């Protein structure tokens, strides 16, 4: 049984009641590893002192591994944090050997590993542990966050050069005692935990439609992403839903959704699966157009929030209206990858080779942000290019998981800033010290800079455009967050 974390009265945290997970759903585990005296326990305690901890033991961990559950509903954080003993004991006795074995077992049970290094000293033991982690866990098998502790002062890339020479793809400088960059570390943990493929527990119903039909046992199904189709009323969402469901090889099951008025359908295309979120229709007929738009907006908001990827459906004959503009703004605000499907394209008369190009130009003039969003014309009723829409959705889902190493990001961003150098003020030159990726969807970077106010809107737009082109981020919101210090 794991040891509970002992707290002094001054640091006592009010216990928080954590929600129970669904049947078979495992709470992820994050373990801190490293040699002795690099500050693992200090980091463990510092993360818990942020008042995120529930005083609850992680079941199945031996008494030599400290653990506590970290839970914060507002930030969507829920995992077990484990502190392992130093893994560099030489010539261990029988007791030390059992401790080491327990620590290595803990690594196997972890979903994410924090490998902690000391900024002031790199030893042979560090290299030995690094080699072990590389051989044991590939980059796909188990994410590893490489943290350099005791970085109490501002760092630039030269201070991290020794660690990059070790072949580390990404280095996060932190201070466990000063709490520097601990918030960023939590964001990285969330980033790796949330980027895993989804799972859903479904209850398959037997073929009989009778009331006494018995449900089959719960089954776990994998899916690549959760898809929502949104658009203004009468844009053809129901027709597109029917068309999409008609293209799959098998509808595995309908699943109760995350909101009271939605149903999720697990669809299989070859060996690939997606979870399609369908919100129910408005139960009462709205007496006014304002009421219809209000209820449509609320349903749209729920669908977007519960999805990983969104198809924004437009009516080819009605163009891009104010309600569509609201949806696009909402997608940007929520950071959801999306693509545009222009429905009822078959109803456009006298089409020429220029028709689609002219339509896009009008669209971009109404909302310039759509310039970097994939657009496809379809007819849901005729099933025109619906298969292409499905293929584009899988492609966008794949691209929305793109992770870029810190070293590559730093190199490219500094090069792009040099290209745009003539637009800088000579008296207020912007300088980037360090940047790192904290999420994939949206593609969110945190940049540590000399002065936030030196980064003007034209430079920010230029950097976003370069990132979109370099990493194929069309349809994926790009967020650049600037910080003048590392606290």
Swiss-Prot record:
Top-level division of the source organism's lineage: Bacteria
Bilayer-spanning residue ranges: none
Stretches assigned to the EngA-type G domain: 28-197, 225-401
Molecular function GO terms recorded: GTP binding; ribosome binding
The UniProt record lists the keyword Cytoplasm: no
Keywords: GTP-binding, Nucleotide-binding, Repeat, Ribosome biogenesis
Residues given in the record as GTP 1 binding sites: 34-41, 83-87, 149-152
Domain KH-like as annotated: residue spans: 402-486
CDD domains named in the record: EngA1 (cd01894), EngA2 (cd01895)
GO biological process: ribosome biogenesis
Location of the region described as Disordered in the Swiss-Prot/TrEMBL record: 1-20
Binding site for GTP 2: 231-238, 278-282, 343-346
Protein function: GTPase that plays an essential role in the late steps of ribosome biogenesis.
Family matches, as PANTHER family: GTPASE DER
Assembly: Associates with the 50S ribosomal subunit.
Protein family (similarity comment): Belongs to the TRAFAC class TrmE-Era-EngA-EngB-Septin-like GTPase superfamily. EngA (Der) GTPase family.
The protein's name: GTPase Der
């Amino acid at each position: 049984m794991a040891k509970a974390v002992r707290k002094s009265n001054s640091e006592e945290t009010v216990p928080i009641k954590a929600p129970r997970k669904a049947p078979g759903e495992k709470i992820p585990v994050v373990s801190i590893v490293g040699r002795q005296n690099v500050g693992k326990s200090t980091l463990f305690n510092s993360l818990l002192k942020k008042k995120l901890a529930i005083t609850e033991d992680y079941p199945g961990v031996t008494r030599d591994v400290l653990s506590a559950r970290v839970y914060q509903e507002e930030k969507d954080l829920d995992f077990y944090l484990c502190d392992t003993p130093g893994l560099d004991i030489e010539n261990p006795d029988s007791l030390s050997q059992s401790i080491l074995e327990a620590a290595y077992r803990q690594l196997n049970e972890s979903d994410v590993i924090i490998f902690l290094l000391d900024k002031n000293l790199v030893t042979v033991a560090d290299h030995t542990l690094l080699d072990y982690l590389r051989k044991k866990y590939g980059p796909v098998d188990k994410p590893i966050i490489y943290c350099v502790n005791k970085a109490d002062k501002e760092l630039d890339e030269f201070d991290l050069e020794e660690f990059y020479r070790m072949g580390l793809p990404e280095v996060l400088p932190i201070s466990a005692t000063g709490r520097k960059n601990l918030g960023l570390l939590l964001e990285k943990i969330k980033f790796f935990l949330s980027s895993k493929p989804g799972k859903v527990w479904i209850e398959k119903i037997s073929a009989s439609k009778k009331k006494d039909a018995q449900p089959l046992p719960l089954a776990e199904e994998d899916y690549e992403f959760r898809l929502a189709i949104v658009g203004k009323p009468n844009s053809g969402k129901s027709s597109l839903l029917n068309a999409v469901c008609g293209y799959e090889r098998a509808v595995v099951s309908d699943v109760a959704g995350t909101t009271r008025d939605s149903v999720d359908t697990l669809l299989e295309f070859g060996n690939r699966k997606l979870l399609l979120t369908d919100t129910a229709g408005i139960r009462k007929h709205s007496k006014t157009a304002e009421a219809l738009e209000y209820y449509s907006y609320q349903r749209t908001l729920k669908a977007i929030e519960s999805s990983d990827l969104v198809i924004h459906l437009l009516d080819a004959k009605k163009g891009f209206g104010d309600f569509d503009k609201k949806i696009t703004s909402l997608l940007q605000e929520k950071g959801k990858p999306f693509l545009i499907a222009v429905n009822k394209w078959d109803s456009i008369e006298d089409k020429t080779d220029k028709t689609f190009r002219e339509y896009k130009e009008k669209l971009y003039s109404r909302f310039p942000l759509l310039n970097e969003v994939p657009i496809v014309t379809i007819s849901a009723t005729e099933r025109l290019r619906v298969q292409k829409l499905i293929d584009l959705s899988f492609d966008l889902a794949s691209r929305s998981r793109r992770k870029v190493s810190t070293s590559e990001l730093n190199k490219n961003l500094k090069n792009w800033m040099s290209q745009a150098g003539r637009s800088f003020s000579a008296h207020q030159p912007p300088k980037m010290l360090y940047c790192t990726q904290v999420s994939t969807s949206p593609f969110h970077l945190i940049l540590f800079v000399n002065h936030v106010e030196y980064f003007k809107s034209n430079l920010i737009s230029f950097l976003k455009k370069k990132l979109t082109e370099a990493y194929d981020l069309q349809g994926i919101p790009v967020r650049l967050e600037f910080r003048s210090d590392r606290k």
